């Protein structure tokens, strides 16, 4: 049985392997935090992502359909479908084991759409129903997975003494994270003139997980440092000293309150 998603071959044409894997991993992590244990395994050049006791409806193949809430990483409802498309388009076969069915996404010409190439999910009934939702992504080598894995902080955790954590998010102080922006543990972008790396607990992103505007970024930077400055003003001061054009410094000039200004003044006097 073929389930035609109606999604054209070139939809989200700038998505590739990273975006495809990201969507499956973020969905798995959301389910993990809801009590459905996630596992990640690389075996015979296949990345295998599983969640315990999960079955999703076929309606999940419709654009805009989502079971995720506001607090989840994937909010726009398109990740499953667009992730499939990106991976298959890039030459990575995908198999999904979902309850009593096996889904195999492919790109095919659709007669009902005048021969347009679209994403089709071929559905086959399994002999034995599975309780775990499992995604198998083919042609993922060790080097590729190592590079991708490093973009998920919940899979490749930073060293504790190289981080500062608050209710707003985490500052990543290791040089390897400089300029790296994460949201809920998933890499978003490498940003010029960031003196450190950051993992925010929440931030408005678009469908492609891009920062909506620079103002939001600067506001978040100020929020996280406001929450940390009393205990770690010396570290903030060192970060600001790295560059006179950093986003941290720009945000500070716009949003710093008197307490933050006083704490930094104390560090300046020490110097």
Locate each region found by the language model.
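Short beta-strand/loop element within the Bergerat-fold HATPase_c
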Residues: 37-45
